């Protein structure tokens, strides 16, 4: 194979039913999709998706053997007010902490500093590293270090040629 993996940008929380305009996890699975992105900041903001709904979507996606890229992140106001670490922990705890160890192997966490998406602003490599370490420690608090170390955490903020080397030089990014 080419190593290329397909990902969907969302899926509905129900496997089937009359939900015009929505695409179910089972439809994506039947098309050979490998991953589904859930919890993206735009879906949270514009579609009022909360952690409870995302937990249902996670379960539905996993039931169809899709891997989940679970997004978490904070706005600039949340970062500036100092609640960013607690907010991201809450998003993870409420979205995926109901899963068992085996299910967690199918979760990728995507940290997306909302304030750095499409704004031209970027998180510094230190900010990205701090949050990635925090996310791993949140996961370790429930599942232990071995599981936390095995979870892929990806950076979903603005990454461009001018900052890529600095970001990728960080141990956890």
Q: Where are the model-predicted features located?
A:
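Active-site loop-to-helix "anion-binding N-cap" substructures in soluble metabolic enzymes
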Residues: 1-110, 114-173
